[in-house]
């Protein structure tokens, strides 16, 4: 965790912390905690806002020192923008802005009072949960491979949250831990995060908690199961594949929810070598796997009363003389044959065997998560994941969960009219569908291996990581998936 969290019900003026975080709207209206500090300081805060020394525009933060009558030596005022437009997005932005500002200063402890602000269609528990998740995300720093480079460990370490809902705090912390676990795996370089490392890390976590267990299948075990599609992708790499299976037994005899995550630890494209820019970001091609593992972490930490199974096919798509080729015909675990049209459409080839394997758990619902297609990014950008399902109830559950926590998805069609694009003369199915509708035809391919399941597909290519040299894994959609499971544990939305 980037931060430690506690609950605090002290009066703002008497709180023993290094800094108190309050808010101010564009019309200069102060948040309730800010009003309390203003009263304690005999109008000092109002005067600073009135003369422009404290900004109130969205995205601004102003640090005020030594307010009279206030125990804390600093007050951070966060601009909240237009009060009439204040809602989920401005609230989450304000929390993130505050955490980033606190992390850069000489402030070890702080009290966040923004949780007192009413957010339309949300309750106090939501405010607390999301404050924890967003502030920890904003405070995260990657340090695993910095070596001798100086790591700045100054700044905020403990954030007290105004409120009294201990369960909301616990669920928020659990979700934040899951997000950070996923981000850390996603950010590791591919010479560190190999299939074996990913499997060992996941198994090590599961081994620490009663009710959690892990099973790691090696190449020989997968071959015995007939996973010819997955193993074909693995043929060109010196880093041998693993199938990671994690189980959380919190729901008695109930059928489990099953998450399957694409775990391509590095994607060269194979024989269809990636020639355009962006190959250096292909370490993020395992973020589907990292994020379902992160969701498992959140579920275990929150002790949700459900059964959960996570399956991650962990494979490196590399090139050598034994690598699979375009025009190869391979046999999947389901028995269906696949003609390889492009070796860079490998994610669906490992997922189809993992989805077939997942059937043995008799899922209540089956959801796969994958950085599957650039086409999804072209269609939807970086703001939302793509969602495909033939099951309206499941799709609506996932969409609602994403909206609730602002980790959103957008539904794309999965109509039968697209299926013909996957026809093959030489096999049961072709692994690519041509130039148009690539995200949808990828979903159609997976649907052929989930025909008897209540299944949905999340294409997270656009949301799993930030672009560019300084980009990092985001941990999305751990928030969406954890909220979906929390909703199921509570008996519905």
From Swiss-Prot:
**DNA damage: present as a keyword of the record?**
no
Q: Sorted alphabetically, which PROSITE patterns does this protein's record hold?
A: CYTOSOL_AP
Q: Give the UniProt subcellular location, in the record's own words.
A: Cytoplasm
UniProt-annotated binding residues for Mn(2+) 1: 267, 344, 346
Q: What is its main location?
A: cytoplasm
Q: Which domain of life is it from?
A: Bacteria
Catalytic machinery residues: 274, 348
GO CC, any one term: cytoplasm
Q: Kindly provide the name given to this protein in its UniProt entry.
A: Probable cytosol aminopeptidase
């Amino acid at each position: 965790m980037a931060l430690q969290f506690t609950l605090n019900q002290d009066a703002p003026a008497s709180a023993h912390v290094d800094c108190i975080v309050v808010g101010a709207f564009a019309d200069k209206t102060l948040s309730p905690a800010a009003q309390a500090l203003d009263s304690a300081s005999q109008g000092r805060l109002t005067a600073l806002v009135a003369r422009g020394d404290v900004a109130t525009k969205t995205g601004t933060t102003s640090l005020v020192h030594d307010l009279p009558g206030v125990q804390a030596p600093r007050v951070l005022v966060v601009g909240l923008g237009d009060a009439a437009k204040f809602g989920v997005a401005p609230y989450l932005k304000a929390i993130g802005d505050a955490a980033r500002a606190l992390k850069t200063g000489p402030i070890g402890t702080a009290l966040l009072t923004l949780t007192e602000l009413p957010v339309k269609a949300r309750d106090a528990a939501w405010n607390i949960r999301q404050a924890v998740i967003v502030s920890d995300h904003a405070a995260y720093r990657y340090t695993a491979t910095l070596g001798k480079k100086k790591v700045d460990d100054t700044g905020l370490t403990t954030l007290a949250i105004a409120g009294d809902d201990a369960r909301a705090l616990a669920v928020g912390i659990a979700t934040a831990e899951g997000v950070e676990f996923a981000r850390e795996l996603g950010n590791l370089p591919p010479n560190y995060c190999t299939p074996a490392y990913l499997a060992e890390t996941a198994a090590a976590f599961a081994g620490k908690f009663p009710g959690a267990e892990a099973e790691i299948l090696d190449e020989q075990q997968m071959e015995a199961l007939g996973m010819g599609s997955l193993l074909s992708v693995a043929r060109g790499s010196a880093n041998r594949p693993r199938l990671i299976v994690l189980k959380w037994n919190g729901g008695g005899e109930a059928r489990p929810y099953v998450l399957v995550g694409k775990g391509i630890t590095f994607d060269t494209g194979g024989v269809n070598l990636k020639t355009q820019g962006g190959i250096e970001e292909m370490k993020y091609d395992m973020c589907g796997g990292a994020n379902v593992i992160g969701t498992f972490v959140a579920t275990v930490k929150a002790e949700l009363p459900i059964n959960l199974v996570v399956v991650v096919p962990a494979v490196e798509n590399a090139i050598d003389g034994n690598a699979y080729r375009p025009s190869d015909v391979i046999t999947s675990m389901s028995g269906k044959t696949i003609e390889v049209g492009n070796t860079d459409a490998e994610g669906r080839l490992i997922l189809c065997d993992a989805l077939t394997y997942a059937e043995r758990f008799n899922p209540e619902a089956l959801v796969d998560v994958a950085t599957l297609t650039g086409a999804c990014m072209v269609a939807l950008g970086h703001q939302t994941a793509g969602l495909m399902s033939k099951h309206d109830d499941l799709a609506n559950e996932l969409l609602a969960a994403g909206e609730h926590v602002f980790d959103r998805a957008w539904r794309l069609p999965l109509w039968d009219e697209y299926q013909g694009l996957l026809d093959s003369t030489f096999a049961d199915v072709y692994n690519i569908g041509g130039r148009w509708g690539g995200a949808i035809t990828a979903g159609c391919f997976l649907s052929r291996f989930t025909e008897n399941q209540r299944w949905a597909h999340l294409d997270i290519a656009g949301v799993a990581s930030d672009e560019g040299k300084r980009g990092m894994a985001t941990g999305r959609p751990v928030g969406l998936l954890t909220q979906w499971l929390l909703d199921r544990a509570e008996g519905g939305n």
